[in-house]
Structures are given as structure tokens and as C-alpha cells.
Amino acid sequence: MAIFDDVKKVVVEQLSVDEDVVKMESKIIEDLGADSLDVVELVMALEEKFDVEIPDSDAEKLVKIEDVVNYIENLQK
């Protein structure tokens, strides 16, 4: 779960949340309190961390941390 750990670090840094609340099933907006600007900044930070490009149309589908992890795993295949 190395990708999850890296995603968690980015989420904690970007959203200023405690790492204990960042779980695979956590919803980025509802559970972690992100607003639309937070989501944009989070996506940009994830793109930089993993050296990937996440189109806006895909970013809208990333609701839970699990979605982010799976998306990045698929990009790295």
C-alpha cells in the first residue's frame, strides 16, 4: 500500500487533517472537509507527487481516497 501512504501524506499536507482520519473509504469532501479549491490543489499536488496528469473530467470522479489510489495505480501500470 505504498501508493496509499504517499496519497495520505499529500492529503494530510494539503487539507491540514490528522493522518488518522485519512482512510481508504474517506470521502475527500464530506469526510475530510475539502472545498472545491482544496480539491483542485490536492489534484495538483498528487500530479506533482506521482508525476502524472489527472484531467478535470477524471478528477471529478475521485470521490474517496480509494478512488485516488486506484486511479494512480492504473496510471502507473
UniProtKB/Swiss-Prot annotation:
GO terms for cellular component: cytosol; membrane. Keywords: Cytoplasm, Fatty acid biosynthesis, Fatty acid metabolism, Lipid biosynthesis, Lipid metabolism, Phosphopantetheine, Phosphoprotein. InterPro entries: ACP, ACP-like_sf, PP-bd_ACP, Ppantetheine_attach_site. It comes from the Bacteria. The modification O-(pantetheine 4'-phosphoryl)serine is found at residue 36. Gene3D superfamilies: ACP-like. Pfam families: PP-binding (PF00550). GO terms for molecular function: acyl binding; acyl carrier activity. 4'-phosphopantetheine is transferred from CoA to a specific serine of apo-ACP by AcpS. This modification is essential for activity because fatty acids are bound in thioester linkage to the sulfhydryl of the prosthetic group. One of its GO terms (biological process) is lipid A biosynthetic process. It is found in: Cytoplasm. Pathway: Lipid metabolism; fatty acid biosynthesis. The keyword Iron-sulfur does not apply. Residues 1-76 form the Carrier domain. Transmembrane segments: none annotated. Carrier of the growing fatty acid chain in fatty acid biosynthesis. Belongs to the acyl carrier protein (ACP) family. This is Acyl carrier protein. It comes from Campylobacter lari (strain RM2100 / D67 / ATCC BAA-1060). The lineage of its organism: Bacteria, Pseudomonadati, Campylobacterota, Epsilonproteobacteria, Campylobacterales. The gene is acpP.
